Amino acid sequence: MLHLENIRVRQGSFTLSAHLTIAKGARVALMGASGSGKSTLLSTLSGFLWPDAGRITMAGADVAKTPVADRPISILFQDGNLFPHLSVFDNVALGIRPNLKLGSEDERRVTRALTQVGLEGMEQRKPSALSGGQQSRVALARMLLRDKPVALLDEPFSALDPGLRREMLSLVRKLCDETGQTLIMATHDLRDAERLCDRVLLLDDGKVVLDAPLAEAVANNAEPLRPWM
């Protein structure tokens, strides 16, 4: 389980406050208007920001005291953070070997990750030769390769057209089914959340104003969620 124990994160005049538990294998939609604290929360979980108070624990260990590279958390950003001068294979391999010095088992793992996301045969292409959906698959393969128990998705597919978004969300759902990863996805789109997630956390001005099973919140027309319905 992932515990956020009375955390408080200050960013200038903005303060994020949260106290919650996320069960292993949960798929959580993190929603809220721009500036509500979604990115601040994800940045804190991933180690880019430090809590000013409280702590984050997973399996009893204080996440903040763990070196970023060793944290049980990986993150997928909207732009994918692909390196244009590197091949698809090397972009994925960076997930486990930043120096790209791979052993034979590393190479097998990279190949397996590319196969899992449907990119076999494209290993030597450069990102510029790929479609937007294929680039998203490269970034997803890199996150998958890191094999962390918690995956954070910061609006990773928002730049894709609706059809490609559905395709990518279906792929993420399939991979989560296979790996049992805990997933937290920031999104502005309730339909995307419904395709992938079973729980919704809605932020407003740095505070959690709704924490509920997603299907139940939608069925009950939960007031904080109405602007997204």
Curated annotation (Swiss-Prot):
ABC transporter domain ranges (all copies): 2-229
Gene Ontology, cellular component aspect: plasma membrane
E.C. number(s) listed in UniProt: 7.6.2.15
Keyword Nucleotide-binding: yes
Localization of this protein: Cell inner membrane
Gene3D superfamilies in alphabetical order: P-loop containing nucleotide triphosphate hydrolases
Residues reported in the UniProt entry to bind ATP: 32-39
InterPro entries noted in UniProt: AAA+_ATPase, ABC_SmlMolc_Importer, ABC_transporter-like_ATP-bd, ABC_transporter-like_CS, P-loop_NTPase
Protein topology in the membrane: Peripheral membrane protein
Catalysis: reaction(s): thiamine(out) + ATP + H2O = thiamine(in) + ADP + phosphate + H(+)
UniProt KW keywords: ATP-binding, Cell inner membrane, Cell membrane, Membrane, Nucleotide-binding, Translocase, Transport
Any one Gene Ontology molecular-function term assigned to this protein's record: ATP binding
Coiled-coil residue windows: none
Family according to the record: Belongs to the ABC transporter superfamily. Thiamine importer (TC 3.A.1.19.1) family.
Role, per record: Part of the ABC transporter complex ThiBPQ involved in thiamine import. Responsible for energy coupling to the transport system.
Subunit structure comment from the entry: The complex is composed of two ATP-binding proteins (ThiQ), two transmembrane proteins (ThiP) and a solute-binding protein (ThiB).
Name by which UniProt lists this protein: Thiamine import ATP-binding protein ThiQ
Record organism: Jannaschia sp. (strain CCS1)
Lineage, opening ranks: Bacteria, Pseudomonadati, Pseudomonadota, Alphaproteobacteria, Rhodobacterales
